[in-house]
Amino acid sequence: MFNNKGRRNVRNNEVRRNVPVKEGETYTVTIEDMGRGGDGIARVEGFVVFVPETQKGETVNVKITAVKSKFAFAEKI
């Protein structure tokens, strides 16, 4: 796609990342690291999921509460 000045429209040419999680789905994950705000960081098929009130090394069942383009939020269940 080109804009009205004959230049490529970068936004339309971006590669869309396949998001492997959906809001409301449940997973069993292991907390691999801790975020700056203290949330645990897990991954589902390499996709980052932030889980509050967890500790590094903990394995928990989670429910996805929000999905963004590069990460998701989940809660322990």
Curated annotation (Swiss-Prot):
InterPro entries: NA-bd_OB-fold, TRAM_dom. It comes from the Archaea. Residues 1-10 have a biased composition (Basic residues). It comes from Methanocaldococcus jannaschii (strain ATCC 43067 / DSM 2661 / JAL-1 / JCM 10045 / NBRC 100440). Residues 11-21 have a biased composition (Basic and acidic residues). Residues 1-21 are annotated as: Disordered. This is Uncharacterized protein MJ0660. Pfam families: TRAM. Residues 20-77 form the TRAM domain.
